A protein has these predicted regions:
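Generic beta-strand structural signal
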Residues: 2, 22-23, 51
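Residue-level recognition of conserved beta-strand positions in structured domain cores
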Residues: 20, 31-32
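Well-ordered beta-strand positions in beta-sheet-rich domains
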Residues: 6, 17, 41-43
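Short aromatic-glycine-enriched beta-strand elements
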Residues: 26-29
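Intrinsically disordered, low-complexity, charged/polar segments
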Residues: 33-53
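Short beta-strand-centered aromatic/proline hotspots
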Residues: 14-23
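A generic beta-sheet turn/junction motif
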Residues: 11-13, 34
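Short coil-to-beta transition motif at edge beta-strands of beta-rich domains
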Residues: 1-11
Length: 53
């Protein structure tokens, strides 16, 4: 996983998708594709995400 990759959450009822905008150790911050607010950033442990094409 690298900044700019598209990812989605694993093991969730409705997958959350977005683009990686920041990474720090095991914490990955993405810009949520379906955010309904101005602040579209969400953070997840890297193990909870998978890269998609």
């Amino acid at each position: 996983m690298e900044i700019g990759d598209r990812v989605q959450t694993l093991n969730t009822f409705v997958p959350i998708t977005g683009e990686i905008v920041d990474m720090y150790k095991n914490l990955v911050t993405i810009a949520d594709d379906d955010a309904e607010t101005v602040d579209q950033l969400l953070s997840f442990p890297a193990d909870d995400l998978e890269v998609i094409s």
